[in-house]
Amino acid sequence: MSFRKVTIIIWALAVILFLLALHHNFLSLSSLLRNDVSDSGIVGLQPIDFTANFHQHPVNERQEEIPVVIAASEDRLGGTIAAINSIHQNTRSNVIFYIVTFNRTADHLRSWLNSGSLKSIRYKIVNFDTKLLEGKVKEDPDQGESMKPLTFARFYLPILVPSAKKAIYMDDDVIVQGDILALYNTPLKPGHAAAFSEDCDSASTKVMIRGAGNQYNYIGYLDYKKERIRKLSMKASTCSFNPGVFVANLTEWKRQNVTNQLEKWMKLNVEEGLYSRTLAGSITTPPLLIVFYQQHSTIDPMWNVRHLGSSAGKRYSPQFVKAAKLLHWNGHFKPWGRAASYADVWEKWYIPDPTGKFSLIRRHMDTSNIK
């Protein structure tokens, strides 16, 4: 074989190896978030665009699908179920739930969804691989409640819902009292990848709220003593927003590489400690505040009536709570716990666990009987 032919073969092999490496890097992120289950069991290493068997109920197929992404943690599974049930019972729209969880929780979740009134919902269970967070999150004992991996699922919406142009994300400690279609139809301004409810958009403009609570701003989440934060020229007094409920334009999200931007700031925080030492809320909030600074639309404040979990007392009137489109128990006092504001409103949407693994904790209950 001539030297020229050998050279050509070597170059051809080099090109093939380069293309294989490029293909592997392109798929690596998607492979970390694998769809979990159909009725037959774990899907395992199926690609992210694998479609599990949806549980069908009669819908108008001409209606646009409304993807709703929600996390399902084992110790908060009752919250996820109640949120899903409240959405399902209050709409006739074509909703598909993308439920993000771990493989170890999938069977428990599936048995709950297959019981009672939830049998007719359409859903897909997606496994969240914690390897996705390596090098992006550091353990902090003071933020233990916020460090749970599933709370970061909201950063990866285009991967969780790969074929959708738009999606809704919501936390598991919410109840929806309005038609989810209205939230989905929230108008987003050109160039905006998401719409949030701002912490200063006080719903008290519509009704007087007793004990309106703290108004948060950027300085409550970011360390303005750090040069990297100061260089961003973000006003410390800028009103923050709540990322527990938002509408995302996934086409714009992908165009702006929002996920990559969020991961960048997560890594920089691990290296430099950019978040406030007295963090006002979830650890997921600071990178979102940076990436979406003055670049987000707003949702109707009645679609995120929050702080119901900030204390056991009732900060809102019964009339206001009834009028709210979405109730959010963000804070330490969850409605499935021993004491929470308007727990009775939440409990109307709760479906008891058929396996008996999850139980509500109530003041009148003997703690020895709690599973």
Swiss-Prot record:
- Report any Pfam family annotated for this entry: Glyco_transf_8
What's the protein here called? Glycosyltransferase 8 domain-containing protein 1
GO CC, one annotated term: Golgi apparatus
**Family statement drawn from the similarity comment of this UniProt entry:** Belongs to the glycosyltransferase 8 family.
Q: Name one GO molecular function term.
A: UDP-glycosyltransferase activity
Q: Looking at the record's lineage, which domain of life comes first?
A: Eukaryota
Species assigned in the record: Rattus norvegicus (Rat)
Membrane-crossing residues? 6-26
Top enzyme category: transferase
SUPFAM superfamilies membership? Nucleotide-diphospho-sugar transferases
**Topological domains, Lumenal:** 27-371
Q: What's its membrane topology?
A: Single-pass type II membrane protein
Task: Please list the residue ranges that the record places on the Cytoplasmic side of the membrane.
Answer: 1-5
